[in-house]
Amino acid sequence: YDQDRANVTYPGAMNDLRLEDIDFEFLSSARHMHFANCFMQPGIRNDLTALFRQAKELGLTTSLDTQWDPEEKWELPLEELLPYVDVFLPNMQEFKFLSESNTVEEGINKLKSFAHYIIIKNGSEGALGWDGKDIIVQHAFKNERVIDCVGAGDSFDAGFIKDFIHNLPLKKCLETGALTGAINTTRAGGTGAFENLETTREIALERFNYKL
């Protein structure tokens, strides 16, 4: 698809999920809460701040990947929401629209007073991570035989969060995120490369010369 593609999504229950549907007692047994695709979930979108606040009160670390806004309005109360989000995970286009900025530096300057970690995914250009002070650049792992890019951003999130919840340095979290995002593109369907840990490790070593 190069850098542009279209997805068709059947929302199903996403349209109806409400804050009151969430079992916070069950959530309290988790270490981390990740929320994605909020613009496709109208029933809970306006309660995101309450959801993330509750998760933090329960002692969880948190992350948010807004993903694309199909209506392209980009209306989120970031100043209220991001104080409860440990890791903000938009891609480059989403970040610029959400922060109403033309550059990464401009966007970070707008968000830095109330954001924690800002991680910006940028496709074949890799990713950027801001830790509250410095910007760290992570180059992409190049896959010369791309099968499918669907789910690459989600796979980046998973790899990053896996290291983040183990308190590894931001640079290592970014590296693992970039690797799992690239591994995703070697199989079709968004999850094909992650059938089991052994398969994922084999792909990492054979395709990217990386021991996972």
Over which residues does each language-model region extend?
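A generic structural signal for short hydrophobic patches within well-formed alpha-helices
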Residues: 22, 95-96, 127, 200
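Acidic, amphipathic alpha-helical patches
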Residues: 22-23, 78, 107, 146
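Alpha-helix C-terminal capping/helix-to-coil transition sites in glycosyltransferase folds
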Residues: 28-29, 83-84, 114
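Conserved beta-alpha-beta core of the PfkB/ribokinase-like small-molecule kinase fold
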Residues: 32-106, 125-126
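Conserved phosphate-binding/catalytic region of the ribokinase-like
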Residues: 54, 71, 104-212
